[in-house]
């Protein structure tokens, strides 16, 4: 986590204002036919996540790996009676989200700075949502077990990861031309499509 933080999670927020779209979505956007700009593609992806996670106003929601708060702030605005706890391993991301939540007058957001390898809580949630965070994790079985404990009996877990159709692999720096492993995703993993099923 320390190398990934240095590479991009603790980069100043101003950089991401320039590099990302208006929601500062630090994960996949969705470009269906007719979508022609990044802001709309971010909106499409955020809407799809909420729909697929079956979010509803009044739920207690835990977001694992909240990035720059695109989903956190989106949920806070659309589900004002929900309580949203967002977890990030980045102090600068936490500061940005908390500042934006105050500016937008969202009183239903709490941000926790923690390494997901060690995060735990006694709270119980209706929904646990994770978008492109599990690619940093290694012990999925243990984390799935903790998530199960965090859910109320009829709660649901929604996980979005990028994946390879058949082969999981680690991003290991193998030389000067290995840009992704060296400069952007050191220690990360490309899961295979079926990997989550193997840890149920």
Give each language-model segment a name.
Residues 68-80:
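Conserved SAM-binding loop of SAM-dependent methyltransferases across substrates and taxa
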Residues 83-88:
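Conserved SAM-binding motif I beta-strand of class I
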Residues 104-116:
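Conserved SAM-binding strand-loop segment of SAM-dependent methyltransferases
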Residues 117-128:
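A short acidic, Gly/Pro-enriched loop at the edge of an enzyme's catalytic core
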């Amino acid at each position: 986590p320390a190398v990934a933080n240095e590479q991009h999670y603790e980069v100043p927020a101003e950089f991401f204002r320039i590099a990302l779209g208006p929601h500062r979505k630090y994960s996949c956007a969705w470009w269906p036919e007719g979508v022609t700009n990044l802001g709309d593609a971010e909106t499409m992806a955020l809407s799809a996540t909420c729909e697929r996670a079956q979010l509803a106003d009044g739920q207690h929601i835990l977001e694992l790996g909240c990035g720059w708060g695109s989903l956190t702030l989106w949920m806070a605005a659309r589900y004002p009676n929900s309580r949203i706890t967002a977890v990030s391993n980045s102090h600068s991301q936490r500061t940005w989200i908390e500042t934006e939540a105050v500016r937008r007058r969202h009183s239903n957001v709490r941000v926790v700075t923690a390494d997901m390898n060690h995060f735990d809580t006694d709270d119980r949630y209706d929904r646990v949502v994770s978008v492109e965070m599990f690619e940093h994790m290694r012990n999925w079985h243990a984390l799935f077990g903790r998530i199960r404990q965090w859910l109320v009996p009829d709660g649901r877990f929604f996980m979005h990861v990028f994946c390879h159709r058949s082969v999981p692999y680690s991003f290991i720096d193998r030389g000067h031309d290995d840009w992704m492993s060296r400069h952007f995703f050191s220690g990360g993993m490309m899961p295979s499509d079926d990997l989550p099923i193997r840890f149920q």
